[in-house]
Amino acid sequence: MTLEATAIEATAIEATGIEATGITATAIEPTPRRSPGSSWLLCGGCGTMLYERRFAREGRVCADCSWHAPMTIQQRLDLLLDADSARPVDVPAIDGDPLEFTDTRPYRDRLRDARASTGLDEAAACVRGTIDGNPVVVVVMDFRFLGGSLGATVGEVFTRGAELALRERTPLLTVTASGGARMQEGAIALMQMAKTSQALGQLDEAGILTVSLITDPTFGGVAASFATLADVIIAEPGARLGFAGRRVIEQTIRQTLPEDFQTAEFLLTHGVVDLISPRRELRANLARLLSVSSRRADGIPRQAGRPDRAVVTDPEQLARRDAWESVRAARRLGRPTTLDYAAMILEDFTELRGDRMSADCPALVAGLGRLDGVPVAVLGTQKGHTADELRYRNFGMPTPAGYRKSARVMRLAAKLGLPVITLIDTAGAYPGVEAEEQAQAVAIAENLRLMAGLPVPVVAVVTGEGGSGGALALAFADRVLMCANAVYSVISAEGCAAILWKNPAAAPTAAAALRVDARELLRLGVVDGVIPEPDGGADADPAGTAARLREALRGALADLLPLDQMNLVTRRRARFRQFGVATPAPATAPAASDDAHESQTDRSVEATR
């Protein structure tokens, strides 16, 4: 929560020297107010009395309203890093007043006063450290220093930190708190947006994880550069992020904005941030992300059982069954969902949300975790087990935002060199007016093109329904498997019956004609293997089904991870090239490049663009 702003305070803008984003001093940073001569503070959110020592022990979070108070650089480092692990990174001094700027006071005087009042040299600092033993380079901002504004020195601190992360191949964590670019440095301050963005681009090219922690507030030039370019964006509860401030927008468009506008909660719904993390959970969330940020050269899953028993590859070993019965079995609500499987077969799974454009689609979940110790990216459609969950999850039918979210996470997997696992249980892509307005067809097509050249292993499993292009958009893979009671088809049996038989009641006949069941699809070569289900089906024994799925995935990854990028992409393209031709066409290798023969442990994102 934040104190309500009542007017734009010119003195606050003058003091901080940030760009005019339309945020007031009270809206920018409500701080706990100290009662004179007392160890008690007043909460900046709800106004309740806070005992200072207890407030500090609880991470400067109000126990009554969960308001997250601002933190200094040192407080932030103490919260996040392992004890005694922080090692400051020196940044050479640069000219702090390139324009010799004076308004009502000389800029150099403002800098001198900010240094005296905060004990800091500038609004940002860089350190090396560890989080739960995972090495990380951290750049932290402090709003107390001229509103955390972005000037030449702050830009240099960030860029030096990014370059250090690049040299040491260490993840970069940025903690932002800023009102925007520093006006007293003019166009030099503006150029820091380009300079810092360029530095993050180099980390992308090198395959190094970047994480941004958004704290309140993060606006203007910082929001429009390094704060939002990270691979993963975490926000503290209530933290606000935006380019223009609320008041500027309201005055421009003459509309009253939602109460939660630009808050972390608003941004999560609108696809901008991956997760909201209370302070007490930050270290654990960051440690999980850092632990799965790259795959070791020896990262091959162990085979706990016999692969030939985990997956059936000969259709004659599968019993014939009625296709309509398979359709009905695939739709049973008790079948495990993607999140169920993630909880049962993965360690340290962290869900990532949002398409970074406009929305988060709850019908498609994505994230990073570890399978038998091997870091992986997992994507899957999500239905649910109750009527309320089905409605919330859009009955497992992804919108364009869902497919764009999956593409974002697949590109991240390619950058980090992580194998991709997709789990598919959907009647198809969501058919609606908004979906068409947002280019549903384009989103599906772009996923297909992306997956065709993804330079990491991809394993797809149809766990329930595999409906048309909406399913295929996650199933362009090196290895395509399906559960024994799953189905996969160009159209639903009911839809086919209505169109071709002119009678929806002919759905059982249409299902048989479409050959939607596992045995027929294995015989046709559409799938590479079938995962047997326990007696009674996956819904009768979710844990047993998950164990079989885990073993099947282990076997597939053990086969695929040793292959280099050229082999992977060539084989994947050849697999899909041969459908519909009597004689398989010769495989066409990807265009030659300098890293065409690199192993999967080498990082490359060029093939995903």
Curated annotation (Swiss-Prot):
GO terms for biological process: fatty acid biosynthetic process; malonyl-CoA biosynthetic process. Residues 39-308 form the CoA carboxyltransferase N-terminal domain. Residues 582-609 are annotated as: Disordered. The keyword RNA-binding does not apply. Keywords: ATP-binding, Cytoplasm, Fatty acid biosynthesis, Fatty acid metabolism, Lipid biosynthesis, Lipid metabolism, Metal-binding, Nucleotide-binding, Transferase, Zinc, Zinc-finger. Residues 39-559 are annotated as: Carboxyltransferase. Disulfide bonds: none annotated. A zinc finger (C4-type) spans 43-65. It comes from the Bacteria. It is found in: Cytoplasm. Residues 314-559 form the CoA carboxyltransferase C-terminal domain. It catalyses: N(6)-carboxybiotinyl-L-lysyl-[protein] + acetyl-CoA = N(6)-biotinyl-L-lysyl-[protein] + malonyl-CoA. Zn(2+) binds at C43, C46, C62, C65. The keyword Hydrolase does not apply. Pathway: Lipid metabolism; malonyl-CoA biosynthesis; malonyl-CoA from acetyl-CoA: step 1/1. Its cofactor is Zn(2+). Its EC number is 2.1.3.15. Signal peptide: none annotated. SUPFAM superfamilies: ClpP/crotonase. Residues 594-609 have a biased composition (Basic and acidic residues). NCBIfam families: accA, AccA_sub, accD. This is Acetyl-coenzyme A carboxylase carboxyl transferase subunits beta/alpha.
